[in-house]
UniProtKB/Swiss-Prot annotation:
<dbReference type="GO" id="GO:0007165">
    <property type="term" value="P:signal transduction"/>
</dbReference>
<comment type="function">
    <text>Mitochondrial enzyme that catalyzes the dephosphorylation and concomitant reactivation of the alpha subunit of the E1 component of the pyruvate dehydrogenase complex (PDC), thereby stimulating the conversion of pyruvate into acetyl-CoA. Acts as a crucial regulator of T cell metabolism and function, with a particular focus on T-helper Th17.</text>
</comment>
<dbReference type="InterPro" id="IPR015655">
    <property type="entry name" value="PP2C"/>
</dbReference>
<dbReference type="InterPro" id="IPR000222">
    <property type="entry name" value="PP2C_BS"/>
</dbReference>
<keyword id="KW-0904">Protein phosphatase</keyword>
<comment type="similarity">
    <text>Belongs to the PP2C family.</text>
</comment>
<keyword id="KW-0378">Hydrolase</keyword>
<feature type="binding site">
    <location>
        <position position="142"/>
    </location>
    <ligand>
        <name>Mn(2+) 2</name>
    </ligand>
</feature>
<feature type="binding site">
    <location>
        <position position="509"/>
    </location>
    <ligand>
        <name>Mn(2+) 2</name>
    </ligand>
</feature>
<keyword id="KW-0460">Magnesium</keyword>
<dbReference type="InterPro" id="IPR036457">
    <property type="entry name" value="PPM-type-like_dom_sf"/>
</dbReference>
<dbReference type="InterPro" id="IPR001932">
    <property type="entry name" value="PPM-type_phosphatase-like_dom"/>
</dbReference>
<keyword id="KW-0496">Mitochondrion</keyword>
<keyword id="KW-0479">Metal-binding</keyword>
<protein>
    <recommendedName>
        <fullName>[Pyruvate dehydrogenase [acetyl-transferring]]-phosphatase 2, mitochondrial</fullName>
        <ecNumber>3.1.3.43</ecNumber>
    </recommendedName>
</protein>
<dbReference type="GO" id="GO:0004722">
    <property type="term" value="F:protein serine/threonine phosphatase activity"/>
</dbReference>
<dbReference type="GO" id="GO:0042594">
    <property type="term" value="P:response to starvation"/>
</dbReference>
Length: 530
């Protein structure tokens, strides 16, 4: 590695961080880039603040040690094999073999991977099938301010969704089992990755709140359960409400109490897909994203976005915020492209400091919590007058799958910060060609210099490394290893993988990717049968 890619990356990242003071924490946010942290918490002891900096920035002590050592410290060169080993450490792949009413599942297989920037990683992912109803759920959960909220949502949201879809009769059986202390009917069949974690200590508390939810559904007396769109809408909002209420209720168990506080005061965006035959529903709250890779009748590929990012660049989202708050706050709702100047996404689970009144926050935090040990962020943004400013209400999109819909990509914003929608589709199609699944058809558009340049770059990149077997890994490789021209740079890729922990997060986010491949023959059968 030259002297050196990682050194340049560190200096670039360090100069793009600004510091705000809030309570006993230093809250940092990117000064100019939209592709940086959402919430970021540091203990004052872990920072060396440099007030004389022309950028008003700071040097991390650990990172500063790297900048003050000799250049040979940055000459760690990974071999191509070591790079691939690091990239593939978190990958997972599953084939779907079950049948639905005699017709093969519309999902053929799915592949996922995750690359951490935070330590510990704040992203979560999940895949589960509904046992009492039909359908498979896929979810990406992007945490901020810690991993606690993303962890909780990844474990609990699918249960709320599955219960929402249950018939009145099934819910009665669930309630009867609880009343008679008998085993519950199975709700979900999880497809867990070996690295997935779970909070077993609070399962009973979560079950109690899930039971209250299904009791309320029973009171609605709906024979067939909620529609999929209603189920997604209610599940997101009900879980977020429970997260908020759980920490307000008296809890005697110290572990549960502390964890509930961490969940409520951290946050998570979520993007969830429910696939039932040809029926695809997407629910999104925040800036994760879902897109479809579509191959037209002429063989040309295109991208079909299924979500909209809920952030300051979404005019519809800005209009929603203005409708929900007084006109006097129009100029302060978004400051520096962030909600109240502190949060990039405008929808998220948790983050009660942007939902509760100041009085409620103070009352909860004064109930004997060790907020210092729990690293709870105590900061009220300026212009905080009419909460809530944040919501977990999702936007739900329905799409009827067609034989030309070949794959679905769900990913946290760490991927979309690096690659646009069209790049992602192009890379997945190229991956399919390399691993022999499918030969991509040439676009029938007239050739032009830009198109020819793109083809040349693809050919050049393909010779730099052996083909990844996992599409999600392939996307992550290109997300962090490609330059501004779309060319794969092995030196850049190695540098991005060897950055110190405290520097890596300044330059990129956690990246979690899931690619769901559809069974075109099965979908065609659904269409023929009506």
């Amino acid at each position: 590695m030259s002297s050196t890619a990682s050194y340049r990356i560190f200096n670039f990242a360090r100069n793009r961080i600004a510091v705000l003071r809030g309570g006993r924490r230093l809250y940092s946010r990117a000064a100019t880039s939209r592709n940086q942290v959402k919430w970021r918490l540091f203990s004052p002891a872990s920072l060396a603040v440099n007030d004389s900096s022309p950028h008003g920035g700071f040097a991390l002590r650990k990172a500063y040690r790297h900048t003050s050592t000799e250049e040979e410290d940055f000459h760690l060169q990974l071999s191509p094999e070591q790079v691939s080993d690091l990239l593939r450490a978190g990958e997972s792949s599953h084939k779907v073999l079950d049948f639905n009413s005699g017709v093969p599942n519309s999902v053929l297989r799915f592949e996922s991977n995750q690359l951490a920037a935070n330590s510990p990683v704040e992203d979560r992912q999940g895949v589960a099938s509904c046992v009492q109803t039909r359908g498979t759920m896929f979810g990406i959960f992007d945490g901020h301010g810690g991993h606690a909220c993303a962890q909780a949502v990844s474990e609990r949201l699918f249960y709320y969704m599955a219960v929402s879809l249950m018939s009145h009769k099934t819910l009665e059986q669930m309630e009867e089992a609880m009343e008679n202390m008998k085993p519950l009917l199975p709700i979900l069949q999880w497809l867990k990755h070996p690295g997935d974690s779970i909070y077993k200590d609070i399962t009973s508390v979560h079950l109690d709140h899930l039971r209250v939810y299904w009791q309320e559904l029973l009171d609605l007396h709906m024979e067939t359960g909620l529609s999929t769109e209603e189920a997604l809408m209610y599940s997101f909002q009900r879980l977020d409400s429970d997260i908020s209420l759980e920490i307000q209720a008296p809890l005697e168990d110290e572990v549960t109490k502390n964890l509930s506080l961490q969940v409520a005061f951290s946050g998570a965006t979520a993007c969830m897909a429910h696939v039932d035959g040809v029926h695809l529903h997407i629910a999104n709250a925040g800036d994760c994203r879902a897109i479809l890779g579509v191959q037209g009748d002429n063989g040309a590929w295109s991208c079909l976005p299924l979500t909209c990012d809920h952030n300051a660049w979404n005019e519809a989202e800005l209009s929603r915020l203005k409708r929900e708050h007084p006109e006097s706050e129009d100029r302060t709702l978004i400051i520096d492209d962030r909600l109240l100047g502190v949060l990039l996404p405008c929808r998220a689970f948790g983050d009660v400091q942007l939902k509760w009144s100041k009085e409620l926050q103070r009352n909860v935090l004064e109930r004997g919590f060790d907020t210092e040990a729990l690293n709870i962020y105590q900061f009220t943004p300026p212009h905080y007058h009419t909460p809530p400013y944040l919501t977990a209400k999702p936007e739900v999109t329905y799409h009827r799958l067609r034989p030309q819909d070949k794959f679905l990509v769900l990913a946290s914003d760490g991927l979309w910060d690096m690659l646009d929608n069209e790049d992602v589709v192009r890379l997945v199609v190229g991956h399919l060609s390399k691993v022999g699944h499918q030969k991509p058809a040439l676009d029938q558009r007239p050739a032009n210099l830009g198109h020819m340049q793109s083809l040349l770059l693809q050919r050049k990149a393909s010779g730099l490394h052996a083909a990844d077997q996992n599409a999600a890994t392939h996307l992550i490789r290109h997300a962090i290893g490609s330059n501004e021209y779309g060319e794969m740079e092995p030196e850049r890729l190695a540098a991005m993988l060897t950055l110190p922990e405290d520097v890596a997060r300044m330059y990129r986010d956690d990246i979690t990717v899931m690619v769901v491949f559809f069974n075109s023959e099965s979908i065609d059968t659904y269409f023929k049968e009506g």
